[in-house]
C-alpha cells in the first residue's frame, strides 16, 4: 500500500498533525474559536499592511499626505486602509475574549502556552502603538510623545533611553522612520511567536469547558472544527467589513484628521480604545514612576495568574463564587476603559483610582481566597 503523503511528508506531516488529524475535545464551545480568529486577523493585517506600505512614505513631511493619497488615488486604497485600521480593533477584541476564555476555563494551567500568549499580547500592543504613530496626525504625534516619554521615569537611564528611542531630543523624523521599520517587523515576530504558542498547546492538547481530561472523547480537527472555524471567520468578517464600509472612523480619534503639529497640544490626549483600561490605571497614580509601574503591572500581572490558582477544579464552570468575581472583573475593566476616555477631572479621577485598586485586588487577592474557600465548601 502506498504511503499517505499527508502523513509521511516532513512538511505536510506538520500541517496534518496541527490542522487535520489533530485530536480535539468533542465539547469545546465557540469560545475556542478565537485562536483561529486571531490567526486570520494576523493574516489580514499583514496583507492589508503590506499593500499600505507600498504607498506609504515614512517621512514627517510626507507621511500624512501619503496616507491621504492612498485613500484618494489608489484603487480601493480607502478600503485597504479602513480594513487595516479597524482590523486592529477586531484583533484586540478577539485577543481580549481569548484571554478571558483562558482565564474562565483555567487554560492558564498550561503555563508555557499561557506565558507565550502574554508575550504575544505585549508584542501586539507594541505593534499597534507604533502603527498608530504612522499616519502622523495630531493624536499620532502626541500619543507617541506622551507614551515614549514614560520611559524617562526609569531612574538613572530613563532620559538617555527616551532620547535613544526618539533618535533626537523630541519625536521627529528619525522616530517615524524607526517606528515604520518596527511596525513592519513586529507582525512577523508575532507570527513566529504564534507558532511557538501552538507548539506548546499541542504538547498538552486543548482544554475544554468542563476543565477535565478529555482523552476518552476526542474527534479529528478536520472536518469538524475546520468548518466551525470557517463559520467563525464569516461571523467576524461581517461586522469588520460593515464597520470599514459604513463607519470607518467610529473608533478613531477626530484629532488624527489634523496633521501633526508639535506647537499645538490636543485638549485630551488619549490612546485607541483598546489601551484605555491600561491608560486609566496609569493616570490613577499621581506619580510618574508609580504610574508607569502600575501600567506595566496591569498586563504583567497575568504572569502570576497560574501561581494564584488555589482551586482544586480547573474551570470556573462549577464555581459560582469565582464566576461572580470573574464577571465583576470584566465590569471593572469596562469601567476602566470608560474612565480612560474621560478628561482628568473630579468624578473620573476617584472612579479610576477605585477601579484600578479593585482590578489588582480581584486578581491578586480575591481570586486565590475565593478558590480556597470553594475547596473548603466542597470538602476538598
From Swiss-Prot:
Heme 1 (or BL or b562) is low-potential and absorbs at about 562 nm, and heme 2 (or BH or b566) is high-potential and absorbs at about 566 nm. Its cofactor is heme b. This is Cytochrome b. Binds 2 heme b groups non-covalently. Gene3D superfamilies: Cytochrome Bc1 Complex, Chain C. It is a multi-pass membrane protein. It comes from the Eukaryota. GO terms for biological process: mitochondrial electron transport, ubiquinol to cytochrome c. Belongs to the cytochrome b family. The gene is MT-CYB. CDD domains: cytochrome_b_C, Cytochrome_b_N. Keywords: Electron transport, Extinct organism protein, Heme, Iron, Membrane, Metal-binding, Mitochondrion, Mitochondrion inner membrane, Respiratory chain, Transmembrane, Transmembrane helix, Transport, Ubiquinone. Component of the ubiquinol-cytochrome c reductase complex (complex III or cytochrome b-c1 complex) that is part of the mitochondrial respiratory chain. The b-c1 complex mediates electron transfer from ubiquinol to cytochrome c. Contributes to the generation of a proton gradient across the mitochondrial membrane that is then used for ATP synthesis. Its main location: mitochondrion. A ubiquinone binds at residue 202. Heme b b566 binds at residues 98, 197. Heme b b562 binds at residues 84, 183. GO terms for molecular function: metal ion binding; ubiquinol-cytochrome-c reductase activity. The cytochrome bc1 complex contains 11 subunits: 3 respiratory subunits (MT-CYB, CYC1 and UQCRFS1), 2 core proteins (UQCRC1 and UQCRC2) and 6 low-molecular weight proteins (UQCRH/QCR6, UQCRB/QCR7, UQCRQ/QCR8, UQCR10/QCR9, UQCR11/QCR10 and a cleavage product of UQCRFS1). This cytochrome bc1 complex then forms a dimer.
Amino acid at each position: 500500500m502506498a504511503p499517505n503523503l499527508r502523513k509521511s511528508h516532513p512538511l505536510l506531516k506538520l500541517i496534518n498533525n496541527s490542522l487535520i488529524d489533530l485530536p480535539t475535545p468533542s465539547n469545546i464551545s465557540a469560545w475556542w474559536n478565537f485562536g483561529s480568529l486571531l490567526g486570520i486577523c494576523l493574516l489580514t493585517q499583514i496583507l492589508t499592511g503590506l499593500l499600505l506600505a507600498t504607498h506609504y512614505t515614512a517621512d514627517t513631511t510626507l507621511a500624512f499626505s501619503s496616507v491621504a493619497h492612498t485613500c484618494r488615488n489608489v484603487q480601493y486604497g480607502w478600503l485597504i486602509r479602513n480594513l487595516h485600521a479597524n482590523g486592529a480593533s477586531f484583533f484586540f477584541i478577539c485577543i481580549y475574549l481569548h484571554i478571558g476564555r483562558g482565564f474562565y476555563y483555567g487554560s492558564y494551567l498550561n503555563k508555557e502556552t499561557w506565558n507565550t500568549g502574554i508575550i504575544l499580547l505585549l508584542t501586539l500592543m507594541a505593534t499597534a502603538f507604533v502603527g498608530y504613530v504612522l499616519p502622523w496626525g495630531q493624536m499620532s504625534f502626541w500619543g507617541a510623545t506622551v507614551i515614549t516619554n514614560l520611559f524617562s521615569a526609569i531612574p538613572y537611564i530613563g532620559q538617555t533611553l527616551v532620547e535613544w528611542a526618539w533618535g533626537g531630543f523630541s519625536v521627529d523624523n528619525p522616530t517615524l522612520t524607526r517606528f515604520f521599520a518596527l511596525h513592519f517587523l513586529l507582525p512577523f515576530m508575532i507570527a513566529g511567536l504564534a507558532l511557538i504558542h501552538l507548539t506548546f498547546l499541542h504538547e498538552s492538547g486543548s482544554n475544554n469547558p468542563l476543565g477535565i481530561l478529555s482523552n476518552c472523547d476526542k474527534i479529528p480537527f478536520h472536518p469538524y472544527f475546520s468548518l466551525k472555524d470557517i463559520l467563525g471567520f464569516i461571523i467576524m468578517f461581517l461586522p469588520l467589513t460593515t464597520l470599514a464600509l459604513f463607519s470607518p472612523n467610529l473608533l478613531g480619534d477626530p484629532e488624527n484628521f489634523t496633521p501633526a503639529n508639535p506647537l499645538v497640544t490636543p485638549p485630551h490626549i488619549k490612546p485607541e480604545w483598546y489601551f484605555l483600561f491600561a491608560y486609566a490605571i496609569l493616570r490613577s497614580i499621581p506619580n510618574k514612576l508609580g504610574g508607569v509601574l502600575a501600567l506595566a503591572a496591569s498586563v504583567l500581572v497575568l504572569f502570576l495568574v497560574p501561581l494564584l490558582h488555589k482551586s482544586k477544579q480547573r474551570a470556573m464552570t462549577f464555581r459560582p463564587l469565582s464566576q461572580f468575581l470573574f464577571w465583576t472583573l470584566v465590569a471593572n475593566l469596562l469601567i476602566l476603559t470608560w474612565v480612560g476616555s474621560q478628561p482628568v477631572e473630579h468624578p473620573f479621577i476617584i472612579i479610576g483610582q477605585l477601579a484600578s485598586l479593585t482590578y489588582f485586588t480581584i486578581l491578586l487577592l480575591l481570586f486565590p481566597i475565593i478558590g480556597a474557600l470553594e475547596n473548603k465548601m466542597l470538602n476538598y
